[in-house]
């Protein structure tokens, strides 16, 4: 309770003596406001806005009977005080209303509308909550047990594919080799005069003594055993194609290669189908365009390019693009070292050195951008994917140089003009079109990408969510499968499971093209951005392994 303020002694100095003689026993006032309406309003302890009649009665009770009227000097001081308070209050209200407006101005341009600076910072903080799993303790015994089971399943899968490959190439009889018909045609052309009509069918038939015991394309088990086995994946934003399980073989005896796809229907039924037929292939882009693939071109992280029109077994979604890009994710290093030691290759360093120089240029640009993306990588990379998808009107993934320059400005990513020109020349050499570049290749080249070990867990997490193998996952399924029980903030009691789950879904949905579903490309971009801020591979794997229970 505020003690009563006695204003009876506030009089002019000239009248102080006269006022001191006034009987103070009659003064039972708490506050006596002036007759004029005050600027800020006087609020009495008993005043209520909904009872005006009661207010008048209270005012009449507290007015002293013999209080002298204020002098002109006192009235002037009061008016000055009231005007100063009124002006100060107006300035305070004006400042408080201007601060939220300044904070709510959008930072990005037309493609990043509707997000204020505070909102963007909030989304970044919520995305960084996922990095808490990196420090979460996880049972080593459980990890070892699961990895052992997974290793056995992978070895069994590779053995099945290798057996099918051997059967396909050894079961074909030499007598039915197409090369036998070529020999017959050459013999016919030497027998039949040029001016005569085409020889009858009986002449064109191949007899037994004209059949070769072995053709150039005939293979033996010894030839097929000199091989390097590798795992691969399709570089595509189409989730169904990106998650295909591919196993390839590079044969040292003729520098040829083939790729098979391992399919699983349900829990027990499997199928092994040829994906890329066995043949000798050449680079389709880059500094080595037109040169034949060699043993030195096969390593973890290498990208193999093929013309999609030359592969009859490819699905329609892949044939829509002129080039098929295949990334080697894992390789049999023991077999690779053995074949390299057996075949002393020459000139390999000279062939690789220009590409190594290109990698150094790209690495320098990537290091500069990673500093800018350290805290906000998830939001920017997913936002860029959505931005490029909106510009891709034809649906082939190809964009022009001006589109990429505008994208960097839109997302406030600083790249010098000299660095961008060097980067663009390198990227054009790796593309199939002259003036346009695939925006997926652009992102991989300018920002870099996580290593294949990390990427394998991203694919595992998405494949676990994609029950129907469509390449698209609904937000409802993500909410059902995401588990936040082992998040450090949940264990310590600072957050609930629902809060961690909601923050993850909010940051993921905020940058997706559709609010109720997430594509593989968007899912990959999200974790690609998180990967920038995580140094250790095992720490990043925990971010995926713990909530998705991989």
Swiss-Prot record:
Ca(2+) binds at residues 466, 468, 470, 477. Residues 181-190 have a biased composition (Polar residues). Keywords: Calcium, Metal-binding, Repeat. It comes from Mus musculus. This is Calcyphosin-2. GO terms for molecular function: calcium ion binding. It holds the Pfam family PH_CAYP2. SUPFAM superfamilies: EF-hand. The keyword Disulfide bond does not apply. Residues 1-20, 175-198 are annotated as: Disordered. Residues 379-414, 415-452, 453-488 form the EF-hand domain.
């Amino acid at each position: 309770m505020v003690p009563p303020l006695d204003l009876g002694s506030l009089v002019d100095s000239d009248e102080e003596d006269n006022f001191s003689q006034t009987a103070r026993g009659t003064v039972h006032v708490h506050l006596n406001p002036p007759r004029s309406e005050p600027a800020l309003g006087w609020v009495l302890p008993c005043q209520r806005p909904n009872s005006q009649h009661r207010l008048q009665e209270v005012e009449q009770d507290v007015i002293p009977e013999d209080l002298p009227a204020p002098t002109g000097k006192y009235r002037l001081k009061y008016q000055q005080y009231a005007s100063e308070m009124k002006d100060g209050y107006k300035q305070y209200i004006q400042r408080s209303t201007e601060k939220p407006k300044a904070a709510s101005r959008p930072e990005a341009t037309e493609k990043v509308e509707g997000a204020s600076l505070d909102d963007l910072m909030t989304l970044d903080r919520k995305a960084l909550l996922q990095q808490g799993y990196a420090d979460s303790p996880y049972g080593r015994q459980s990890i070892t047990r699961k990895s052992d089971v997974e290793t056995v399943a992978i070895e069994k899968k590779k053995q099945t594919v290798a057996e099918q490959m051997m059967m396909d190439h050894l079961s074909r009889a030499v007598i039915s080799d197409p090369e036998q018909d070529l020999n017959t045609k050459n013999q016919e052309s030497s027998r039949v005069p040029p001016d005569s009509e085409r020889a009858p069918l009986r002449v064109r038939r191949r007899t037994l003594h004209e059949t070769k015991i072995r053709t150039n394309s005939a293979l033996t088990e010894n030839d097929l055993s000199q091989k390097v086995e590798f795992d691969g994946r399709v570089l595509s934003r189409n989730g169904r194609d990106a998650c295909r399980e591919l196993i390839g073989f590079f044969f040292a005896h003729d520098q040829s290669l083939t790729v098979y796809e391992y399919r699983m229907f349900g829990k027990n039924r499997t199928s092994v189908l040829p994906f890329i037929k066995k043949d000798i292939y050449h680079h389709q882009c880059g500094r080595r365009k037109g040169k034949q693939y060699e043993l030195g071109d096969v390593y973890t992280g290498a990208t193999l390019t093929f013309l999609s029109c030359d592969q009859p077994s490819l699905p329609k979604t892949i044939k829509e693009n002129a080039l098929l890009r295949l990334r080697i994710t894992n390789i049999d290093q023991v077999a690779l070292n053995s074949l390299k030691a057996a075949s002393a290759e020459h000139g390999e360093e000279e062939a690789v050195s220009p590409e190594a120089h290109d990698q150094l240029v790209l690495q320098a640009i990537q290091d500069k951008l990673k500093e800018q993306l350290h805290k906000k990588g998830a939001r920017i990379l997913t936002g860029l994917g959505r931005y490029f998808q909106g510009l891709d009107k034809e649906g082939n993934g190809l964009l022009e140089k001006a589109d990429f320059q505008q994208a960097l400005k839109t997302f406030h990513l600083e790249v010098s003009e000299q660095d961008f020109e060097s980067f663009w020349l390198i990227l054009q050499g790796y593309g199939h079109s002259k003036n346009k570049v695939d925006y997926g290749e652009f992102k991989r080249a300018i920002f870099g990408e996580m290593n294949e070990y990390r990427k394998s867990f991203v694919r595992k997490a998405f494949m676990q969510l994609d029950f129907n193998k469509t390449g698209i996952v609904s937000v409802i399924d993500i909410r059902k499968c995401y588990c936040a029980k082992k998040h450090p903030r949940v264990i310590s009691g600072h957050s609930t499971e629902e809060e961690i789950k909601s923050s993850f879904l909010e940051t993921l949905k905020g940058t997706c093209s559709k609010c109720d579903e997430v594509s593989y490309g968007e899912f990959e971009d999200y974790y690609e951005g998180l990967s920038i801020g995580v140094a250790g591979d095992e720490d990043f794997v925990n971010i995926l392994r713990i909530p998705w229970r991989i």
